[in-house]
């Protein structure tokens, strides 16, 4: 199993050191909530390298008309899982990546302070790949071993009405079924609850 080292970097991940980060508040030095996102750049296109460029601050926003609005945007995520399952890391887990935006969870605002962001290469309109679920499960296991993972939520849970990702094609039931591999955290967000409630209803009818 992969591990996260003392500096907050995942062993074996493709490492890129984004300039888009800052320090976590001292009280949030141990992040225990994971936020799941999806992203493609340009929208709907895979394996372009543009996501890496965005997080590194080197995106050519003139390369495609859909990128123009991203000019000057300074964002990052701790991790990015490509369609192949390859894991890229841009910010140490001990630092504050800029993935959540205006957000609130469990009565707290500014979710970047206390969360780890994981971007999955994908959209709201297509299923994710088997390799991505396998990589995500392994990554969550490493996060749990290092930080005692407490809960896993969607970007849409912490920014309802503003964000929709990782979207309806993300299989929360599948992730929930593998939860013992990463400490059986809570799945209390609305995105997960909708799918899990359907699972419960199927069991009740059986």
Where are these regions (language model features)?
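A generic alpha-helix propensity feature with a strong bias for hydrophobic helices
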Residues: 28, 45, 68, 169-171, ...
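Histidine-centered divalent metal-coordination motifs
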Residues: 37-39, 155
């Amino acid at each position: 199993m992969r591990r996260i080292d003392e500096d907050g970097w995942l062993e074996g991940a493709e490492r890129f050191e984004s300039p888009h980060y800052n320090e976590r508040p001292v009280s949030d030095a141990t992040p225990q909530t994971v936020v799941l996102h999806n992203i493609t750049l340009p929208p709907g296109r895979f394996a372009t390298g543009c996501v890496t460029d965005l997080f590194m601050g080197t995106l050519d926003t003139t390369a495609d008309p859909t990128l123009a609005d991203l000019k000057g945007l300074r964002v990052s995520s701790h991790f990015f899982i490509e369609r192949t399952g390859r894991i890229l890391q841009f910010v140490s887990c001990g630092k504050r990546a800029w993935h959540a935006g205006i957000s609130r969870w469990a009565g707290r605002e500014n979710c970047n302070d206390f969360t780890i962001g994981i971007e999955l290469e994908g959209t709201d309109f297509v299923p994710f790949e088997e390799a991505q679920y396998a990589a995500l499960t392994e990554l969550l296991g490493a996060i749990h071993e290092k930080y005692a993972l407490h809960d896993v939520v969607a970007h849409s849970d912490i920014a309802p009405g503003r964000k929709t990702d990782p979207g309806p094609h993300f299989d929360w039931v599948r992730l929930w079924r593998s939860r013992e591999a990463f400490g059986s955290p809570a799945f209390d967000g609305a995105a997960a609850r909708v799918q899990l409630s359907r699972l419960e209803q199927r069991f009740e009818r059986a």
